[in-house]
């Protein structure tokens, strides 16, 4: 008689969950919340800046001032003059390494105008956008992992009509100008959930 002995060897390792940003919005879809998973390993500079903005309350009442159907939704101008001044003074951040991650539905990236020009302006992609990702500032820093229906419900009727320059909170007429776009959606506020360590069996 042969005796067969089966041994199962289990090992555990500690893994780090990706940090997330949970945002409340004015969008009248579902609970109005959007959850963004951040990718600090591939975009360390961008994620560090974005995390700092969230923790500082920059996203409070932050309008989606540029929302183009089937393309993108841009944000990043605070209606609070002191807040915007603080982050303007912080300067731009260094570009992250080029990424081959495609710009699919719900990707989060910075807007920019040249090398090392990223500051507070970001955008969300609406649908697949193969034309994005070629500029040095267009590096995905995360992706919407919950609330895609909310993201797609952001009002896009104004398209590119909002003049970004007139949203500068230093202008005396900035609030009055913004009030003229009654249907413009916005973030009510966001909170950062740091990645938690957990055990994974191998």
Where are the regions that the model predicts?
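Cleavable N-terminal signal peptides of Sec/SRP-targeted secreted and luminal proteins
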Residues: 2-16
């Amino acid at each position: 008689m042969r005796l067969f002995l089966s041994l199962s060897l289990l090992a555990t390792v500690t893994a780090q969950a990706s940090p997330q940003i949970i945002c409340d919005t004015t969008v009248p879809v579902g609970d109005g919340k959007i959850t963004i998973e951040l990718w600090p390993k591939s975009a360390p500079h961008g994620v560090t800046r974005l995390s700092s903005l969230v923790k500082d309350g920059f996203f409070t009442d932050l309008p989606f001032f540029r929302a183009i159907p089937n393309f993108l939704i841009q944000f990043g101008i605070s209606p609070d003059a002191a807040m915007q001044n603080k982050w303007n003074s912080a300067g731009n951040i260094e570009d992250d390494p080029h990424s081959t991650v495609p710009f699919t539905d719900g990707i989060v990236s910075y807007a920019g105008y040249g090398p090392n020009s990223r500051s507070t302006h970001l955008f969300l992609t609406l649908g697949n956008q193969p034309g994005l990702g070629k500029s040095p500032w267009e590096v995905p820093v995360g992706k919407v992992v919950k609330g895609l229906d909310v993201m797609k419900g952001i009002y896009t009727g104004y398209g590119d009509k909002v003049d970004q320059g007139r949203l500068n909170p230093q202008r005396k007429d900035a609030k009055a100008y913004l009030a003229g776009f009654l249907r413009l959606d916005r973030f009510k506020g966001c909170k950062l959930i740091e990645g938690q360590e957990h055990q994974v069996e191998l």
